[in-house]
Amino acid sequence: LKRTTQLITGALLMFGAALMQAQPAHATVVKNSFLKTQRTIRTYNINKHAKLTLPKGTVVQVAGTKHLHGNKYVDVYVDRLSYNIRKPLLSVKKPTIYSHWIRAKGDNFKQIHKPSYLSYYAAQSDGKQSHGKIRTETGNLWKGTRLPVDYATSVAARLRVTTNGYLEYDASSPFVFKISPKPTTSLKVAKASQPMASGKTILTFKSRLKQLPFTKKSKGHYQLTITNAEAGTITVVPNTSKVQKILTNWIFKVGKQSWYENNSVTTFK
């Protein structure tokens, strides 16, 4: 009996290993998954109005998936990439934030975990809906503690870390935009960490931006810390008895400064 059990166990292990090997690398790719390009990919935006180039090694976030003739395809959020990649979208009349469909095969992409430099926000919850509330987790942080009621016509300082690891700062960004405008300045993240249970995302750079509260650690070694303040505010639009929207704002500390992310919206008919 013992020998039989060993044979069965061995067979199951071999079957499991074979099954894992047979499982396509793209099988677990879903909306909001992260991928890294394995070669330079030349494509378009979804309506083919702009040519786009995704250099080899670019981290992208999946906007959607589809199957065609037994193959899996993805489109990615181009607007969440650095300015040098999304720039062509800013010159077309009807820009879209998504790429054209790209085959999700190993020659094109490798699936990766969420990058540590994006740890400050819930990137993989973006777009989820529950009881009329839509999550808006895009990583855009605005200076202050609350989205203004007239946000549709207002501007403010904004920062974010792009999917491919660039810190972007815009001194006067509109709250409403289709494609993120050219930033005032930007910087490549050299390294990132998130000490366990600290609520902090520590970004390390080789230089610094004068507009933000960097800490100099040594020559060519600067840090910017984004801390979850575990507090929030709400914005009611309009702020009268006939409410149309309620937006929630989650507060962060960048250094000692207060910034916030608008992380959900509930719309009333």
Describe each model-derived feature in a short phrase:
Residues 26-269:
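Beta-loop motif signature
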Residues 1-27:
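Sec-dependent N-terminal signal peptides of Gram-positive bacterial secreted proteins and lipoproteins
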